[in-house]
Amino acid sequence: MSKLPEEHKFIDLSDYGRPVAKIIANYLKNTIFTPIHVTIGFIIAGFLAIYCMLENLYWYAAFFLILKSILDAADGELARVKQKPSYTGRYLDSVADILLNAFIFITIGYLTNADYWSCFFAFFGLQLQGTLYNYYYTILRNKFNGDTTSRVFENSTPKALAGEKQKHVTLLFGLYKFMYGVFDKIIYYLDSSAENSKRCPNLFMTAVSVFGLGFQLLLIASMLVLGLKAFIIPFFLINTILVFIFIAIRKLFFNR
Protein backbone atom coordinates (compact mmCIF):
# COMPACT_ATOMS: atom_id res chain seq x y z
CA MET A 1 0.00 0.00 0.00
CA SER A 2 3.02 2.28 -0.49
CA LYS A 3 1.25 4.20 -3.26
CA LEU A 4 -0.93 6.04 -0.71
CA PRO A 5 -0.17 8.53 2.06
CA GLU A 6 -0.11 6.87 5.49
CA GLU A 7 -3.42 8.30 6.71
CA HIS A 8 -5.33 6.92 3.73
CA LYS A 9 -3.89 3.41 3.60
CA PHE A 10 -6.22 0.44 3.95
CA ILE A 11 -5.66 -3.29 4.40
CA ASP A 12 -5.15 -4.54 0.85
CA LEU A 13 -5.78 -8.28 0.74
CA SER A 14 -4.16 -8.51 -2.68
CA ASP A 15 -0.94 -6.85 -1.50
CA TYR A 16 0.39 -9.64 0.75
CA GLY A 17 3.63 -9.74 -1.25
CA ARG A 18 4.54 -6.12 -0.49
CA PRO A 19 6.89 -6.78 2.50
CA VAL A 20 8.98 -9.24 0.49
CA ALA A 21 8.76 -6.97 -2.56
CA LYS A 22 10.28 -4.13 -0.52
CA ILE A 23 13.13 -6.36 0.59
CA ILE A 24 13.83 -7.32 -3.02
CA ALA A 25 13.66 -3.69 -4.15
CA ASN A 26 16.04 -2.48 -1.45
CA TYR A 27 18.45 -5.31 -2.26
CA LEU A 28 18.44 -4.32 -5.95
CA LYS A 29 18.46 -0.56 -5.33
CA ASN A 30 22.18 -0.05 -5.96
CA THR A 31 22.61 -2.73 -8.63
CA ILE A 32 22.38 -2.66 -12.41
CA PHE A 33 18.96 -4.32 -12.26
CA THR A 34 16.00 -2.18 -13.30
CA PRO A 35 12.24 -2.51 -12.73
CA ILE A 36 12.00 -3.91 -16.27
CA HIS A 37 14.29 -6.78 -15.25
CA VAL A 38 11.97 -7.54 -12.33
CA THR A 39 8.95 -7.43 -14.64
CA ILE A 40 10.67 -9.95 -16.91
CA GLY A 41 11.23 -12.04 -13.78
CA PHE A 42 7.52 -12.17 -12.99
CA ILE A 43 6.73 -13.06 -16.59
CA ILE A 44 9.12 -16.02 -16.29
CA ALA A 45 7.53 -16.99 -12.96
CA GLY A 46 4.09 -16.89 -14.60
CA PHE A 47 5.13 -19.19 -17.42
CA LEU A 48 6.83 -21.56 -14.96
CA ALA A 49 3.53 -21.72 -13.05
CA ILE A 50 1.72 -22.62 -16.27
CA TYR A 51 4.30 -25.31 -17.07
CA CYS A 52 3.90 -26.79 -13.58
CA MET A 53 0.12 -26.86 -14.02
CA LEU A 54 0.48 -28.81 -17.25
CA GLU A 55 2.78 -31.26 -15.45
CA ASN A 56 0.29 -31.60 -12.55
CA LEU A 57 2.87 -30.12 -10.17
CA TYR A 58 0.34 -27.98 -8.36
CA TRP A 59 2.41 -27.08 -5.30
CA TYR A 60 5.14 -25.78 -7.57
CA ALA A 61 2.54 -23.99 -9.67
CA ALA A 62 1.18 -22.33 -6.52
CA PHE A 63 4.69 -21.27 -5.53
CA PHE A 64 5.37 -19.63 -8.88
CA LEU A 65 1.96 -17.91 -8.91
CA ILE A 66 2.71 -16.35 -5.53
CA LEU A 67 6.27 -15.51 -6.61
CA LYS A 68 4.79 -13.81 -9.66
CA SER A 69 2.60 -11.69 -7.36
CA ILE A 70 5.58 -10.72 -5.22
CA LEU A 71 7.69 -9.73 -8.22
CA ASP A 72 4.70 -7.87 -9.64
CA ALA A 73 4.87 -5.63 -6.58
CA ALA A 74 8.68 -5.53 -6.53
CA ASP A 75 9.05 -3.87 -9.94
CA GLY A 76 7.03 -0.87 -8.79
CA GLU A 77 8.85 -0.76 -5.46
CA LEU A 78 12.19 -0.78 -7.26
CA ALA A 79 11.06 2.11 -9.46
CA ARG A 80 10.20 4.06 -6.32
CA VAL A 81 13.41 3.39 -4.38
CA LYS A 82 15.48 4.23 -7.46
CA GLN A 83 13.22 7.28 -7.94
CA LYS A 84 12.67 6.38 -11.57
CA PRO A 85 8.92 6.25 -12.32
CA SER A 86 8.22 4.92 -15.79
CA TYR A 87 5.23 4.68 -18.08
CA THR A 88 7.14 2.00 -20.00
CA GLY A 89 7.30 -0.16 -16.89
CA ARG A 90 3.71 0.60 -15.90
CA TYR A 91 2.25 -0.46 -19.26
CA LEU A 92 4.62 -3.42 -19.74
CA ASP A 93 3.53 -4.68 -16.33
CA SER A 94 -0.16 -4.39 -17.25
CA VAL A 95 0.22 -5.98 -20.69
CA ALA A 96 2.19 -8.87 -19.19
CA ASP A 97 -0.47 -9.36 -16.50
CA ILE A 98 -3.38 -9.71 -18.91
CA LEU A 99 -1.50 -12.03 -21.26
CA LEU A 100 -0.42 -14.28 -18.39
CA ASN A 101 -3.98 -14.28 -17.03
CA ALA A 102 -5.25 -15.41 -20.43
CA PHE A 103 -2.68 -18.20 -20.65
CA ILE A 104 -3.45 -19.31 -17.10
CA PHE A 105 -7.16 -19.62 -17.86
CA ILE A 106 -6.50 -21.39 -21.14
CA THR A 107 -4.35 -23.86 -19.21
CA ILE A 108 -6.97 -24.38 -16.50
CA GLY A 109 -9.64 -24.84 -19.16
CA TYR A 110 -7.47 -27.45 -20.89
CA LEU A 111 -6.79 -29.33 -17.64
CA THR A 112 -10.46 -29.38 -16.60
CA ASN A 113 -11.99 -29.89 -20.06
CA ALA A 114 -13.97 -26.69 -19.66
CA ASP A 115 -15.76 -25.42 -22.73
CA TYR A 116 -14.33 -22.44 -24.59
CA TRP A 117 -17.03 -19.96 -23.62
CA SER A 118 -16.88 -20.77 -19.90
CA CYS A 119 -13.13 -20.27 -20.00
CA PHE A 120 -13.48 -16.99 -21.90
CA PHE A 121 -16.13 -15.52 -19.63
CA ALA A 122 -14.25 -16.58 -16.48
CA PHE A 123 -11.19 -14.75 -17.80
CA PHE A 124 -13.38 -11.79 -18.78
CA GLY A 125 -14.89 -11.79 -15.30
CA LEU A 126 -11.49 -11.87 -13.63
CA GLN A 127 -10.36 -8.89 -15.68
CA LEU A 128 -13.56 -6.98 -14.97
CA GLN A 129 -13.12 -7.61 -11.25
CA GLY A 130 -9.54 -6.40 -11.35
CA THR A 131 -10.52 -3.33 -13.35
CA LEU A 132 -13.10 -2.29 -10.73
CA TYR A 133 -10.50 -2.59 -7.98
CA ASN A 134 -7.92 -0.64 -9.98
CA TYR A 135 -10.52 2.01 -10.85
CA TYR A 136 -11.42 2.72 -7.22
CA TYR A 137 -7.79 2.43 -6.09
CA THR A 138 -6.49 4.81 -8.78
CA ILE A 139 -9.16 7.37 -7.88
CA LEU A 140 -8.03 7.15 -4.25
CA ARG A 141 -4.36 7.54 -5.17
CA ASN A 142 -4.97 10.52 -7.40
CA LYS A 143 -7.12 12.25 -4.79
CA PHE A 144 -4.53 11.99 -2.05
CA ASN A 145 -1.28 12.65 -3.90
CA GLY A 146 -0.13 9.09 -4.25
CA ASP A 147 1.64 7.61 -7.28
CA THR A 148 0.11 9.08 -10.45
CA THR A 149 1.76 7.05 -13.22
CA SER A 150 -1.60 5.26 -13.37
CA ARG A 151 -4.47 7.49 -14.46
CA VAL A 152 -8.17 7.11 -13.81
CA PHE A 153 -8.90 7.42 -17.53
CA GLU A 154 -6.28 6.12 -19.96
CA ASN A 155 -7.40 8.14 -22.97
CA SER A 156 -4.26 9.70 -24.44
CA THR A 157 -0.67 8.60 -24.80
CA PRO A 158 1.35 10.06 -21.91
CA LYS A 159 4.58 11.93 -22.44
CA ALA A 160 7.64 9.80 -21.74
CA LEU A 161 9.33 10.51 -18.43
CA ALA A 162 13.05 11.11 -18.01
CA GLY A 163 15.08 8.03 -18.92
CA GLU A 164 12.51 6.37 -21.20
CA LYS A 165 11.79 6.62 -24.91
CA GLN A 166 8.54 8.01 -26.26
CA LYS A 167 8.27 5.26 -28.90
CA HIS A 168 8.30 2.61 -26.17
CA VAL A 169 5.63 4.43 -24.19
CA THR A 170 3.51 4.90 -27.32
CA LEU A 171 3.77 1.23 -28.33
CA LEU A 172 2.99 -0.16 -24.90
CA PHE A 173 0.19 2.34 -24.33
CA GLY A 174 -1.38 1.21 -27.62
CA LEU A 175 -1.21 -2.42 -26.49
CA TYR A 176 -2.63 -1.45 -23.12
CA LYS A 177 -5.59 0.37 -24.68
CA PHE A 178 -6.27 -2.53 -27.02
CA MET A 179 -6.24 -5.11 -24.21
CA TYR A 180 -7.85 -3.16 -21.37
CA GLY A 181 -10.03 -0.62 -23.16
CA VAL A 182 -13.21 -2.68 -23.14
CA PHE A 183 -12.93 -3.38 -19.39
CA ASP A 184 -12.26 0.29 -18.61
CA LYS A 185 -15.30 1.34 -20.65
CA ILE A 186 -17.59 -1.20 -18.98
CA ILE A 187 -16.57 -0.18 -15.47
CA TYR A 188 -16.81 3.52 -16.27
CA TYR A 189 -20.27 2.96 -17.77
CA LEU A 190 -21.38 1.11 -14.64
CA ASP A 191 -19.95 3.67 -12.20
CA SER A 192 -19.04 6.91 -13.96
CA SER A 193 -19.71 9.04 -10.87
CA ALA A 194 -17.07 7.39 -8.68
CA GLU A 195 -14.32 9.92 -9.41
CA ASN A 196 -16.36 12.86 -8.15
CA SER A 197 -17.89 11.14 -5.15
CA LYS A 198 -16.74 11.19 -1.56
CA ARG A 199 -13.91 8.94 -0.48
CA CYS A 200 -14.81 5.29 0.06
CA PRO A 201 -14.01 4.12 3.61
CA ASN A 202 -11.09 1.81 4.27
CA LEU A 203 -13.30 -1.17 5.08
CA PHE A 204 -15.00 -0.92 1.69
CA MET A 205 -11.64 -0.69 -0.11
CA THR A 206 -10.42 -3.73 1.81
CA ALA A 207 -13.47 -5.68 0.67
CA VAL A 208 -12.94 -4.62 -2.96
CA SER A 209 -9.28 -5.64 -2.72
CA VAL A 210 -10.34 -9.28 -3.09
CA PHE A 211 -10.53 -8.32 -6.78
CA GLY A 212 -6.84 -7.39 -6.83
CA LEU A 213 -4.73 -9.68 -9.01
CA GLY A 214 -2.54 -10.79 -6.11
CA PHE A 215 -5.55 -12.13 -4.20
CA GLN A 216 -7.02 -13.70 -7.33
CA LEU A 217 -3.77 -15.57 -8.00
CA LEU A 218 -3.65 -16.64 -4.35
CA LEU A 219 -7.15 -18.11 -4.73
CA ILE A 220 -6.14 -19.96 -7.89
CA ALA A 221 -3.00 -21.28 -6.18
CA SER A 222 -5.02 -22.44 -3.16
CA MET A 223 -7.62 -24.19 -5.30
CA LEU A 224 -4.89 -25.98 -7.25
CA VAL A 225 -3.19 -27.42 -4.17
CA LEU A 226 -6.55 -28.34 -2.59
CA GLY A 227 -7.53 -30.39 -5.63
CA LEU A 228 -10.26 -27.93 -6.61
CA LYS A 229 -9.00 -26.98 -10.06
CA ALA A 230 -12.36 -27.91 -11.62
CA PHE A 231 -14.00 -25.16 -9.54
CA ILE A 232 -11.68 -22.32 -10.59
CA ILE A 233 -13.53 -21.34 -13.75
CA PRO A 234 -17.03 -21.63 -12.19
CA PHE A 235 -15.82 -19.60 -9.20
CA PHE A 236 -14.65 -16.66 -11.28
CA LEU A 237 -17.82 -16.77 -13.34
CA ILE A 238 -19.98 -16.51 -10.22
CA ASN A 239 -17.65 -14.09 -8.43
CA THR A 240 -18.23 -11.51 -11.17
CA ILE A 241 -21.66 -10.88 -9.62
CA LEU A 242 -19.81 -9.08 -6.82
CA VAL A 243 -18.76 -6.39 -9.31
CA PHE A 244 -22.36 -5.22 -9.51
CA ILE A 245 -22.89 -5.60 -5.75
CA PHE A 246 -19.85 -3.46 -4.89
CA ILE A 247 -20.88 -0.79 -7.38
CA ALA A 248 -24.39 -0.74 -5.94
CA ILE A 249 -23.02 -0.40 -2.40
CA ARG A 250 -20.74 2.48 -3.40
CA LYS A 251 -23.52 4.33 -5.19
CA LEU A 252 -25.97 3.78 -2.35
CA PHE A 253 -23.75 4.68 0.61
CA PHE A 254 -20.71 6.60 -0.66
CA ASN A 255 -22.03 8.80 -3.43
CA ARG A 256 -21.87 12.56 -3.01
Where are these regions (language model features)?
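Juxtamembrane helix-capping/reentrant segments at transmembrane boundaries
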Residues: 75, 79, 83-97, 151-156
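Alpha-helical transmembrane segments
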Residues: 109-140
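Membrane-spanning helices that line or support transport/gating and their immediate boundary helices
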Residues: 23, 27, 73, 77, ...
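Transmembrane helix interruption/hinge and helix-loop junction motifs
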Residues: 52-60, 111-117, 225-234
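Select subsegments of transmembrane alpha-helices in polytopic membrane proteins
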Residues: 35-39, 92-98, 205-214
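Hydrophobic, membrane-inserted alpha-helices
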Residues: 24, 42-50, 100-107, 215-223
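Membrane-embedded alpha-helical segments that form the functional core of polytopic membrane enzymes
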Residues: 35-88, 104-105, 121-124
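C-terminal membrane-associated helical module and adjoining short loops/tails
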Residues: 1-19, 139-256
